[in-house]
Regions:
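Contiguous, glycine/small-aliphatic-enriched amphipathic segments in soluble metabolic enzymes
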Residues: 1-161
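Conserved small/polar residues in nucleotide/adenosyl-binding loops
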Residues: 183-184
Length: 184
């Protein structure tokens, strides 16, 4: 049987949702694994129209791994529902908003958004670890998170590796880096 991969959505103000949609719109993804997004269904839903060719993708909101369908065209999202889309701001929006908002109001709104997104990204990683430790998923894959945002949310880690080490009670760990090549 193909492995179930718990894929974290990443920072809701980043490109993780769009990257996930792009990966899951390819039928060959389902030929090698059973992908499951750990994140917010409404963020994933909002990402679909931003990805060319993904218009027919559907979201299957789940709260347990057994509810997943693992079918091409359907994105199974283990929904943690921690993001308020009305408060989510992107870095690229800051310039535009600066024209219509006072600086102190914009700064407060931006800080609130980044803290919320940091908390969300942290919760997605934590849930993916819990699912793996419980044997509900076979492996985890992480989308990018913003370390500043998770720190703003009160979780003081320098990245994914340290979160994994902490929540798996691993004393000795390291990160391996290698050159990455992209194909589009």
């Amino acid at each position: 049987m193909k492995p179930i991969l718990g894929i974290t959505m990443g920072d809701p103000s980043g490109n993780g949702p769009e990257i996930s949609v792009k990966a899951l719109m390819k039928p060959e993804t389902y030929e090698v694994c059973r992908p499951l997004i750990v994140g917010d269904a409404k963020c994933m839903e909002a990402a679909i129209p931003t990805v060319k060719g993904a218009e027919s993708m559907k979201i299957n909101v789940i709260h347990g791994v057994k509810e997943a369908k693992f079918e091409p065209g359907i994105i199974d999202v283990y929904d943690l529902d921690v993001v308020d889309l009305s408060k989510r701001l992107y870095k690229k929006d800051r310039k535009k908003l600066a024209e219509i908002m006072q600086a102190d109001v914009l700064d407060a709104a931006y800080k609130e958004s980044m803290t919320m997104c940091g908390e969300a990204a942290f919760q997605y990683v934590k849930k993916a670890i819990e699912l793996a430790m419980a044997g509900e998923v076979d492996a985890t894959v992480t989308n990018a998170l913003n370390k500043d945002h998770i720190n703003m949310a009160g979780h003081h880690y320098s990245g994914h590796t340290e979160i994994y080490a902490d929540y798996t009670h691993t004393a000795k760990y390291s990160m391996m880096l290698a050159p990455v090549s992209y194909t589009h």
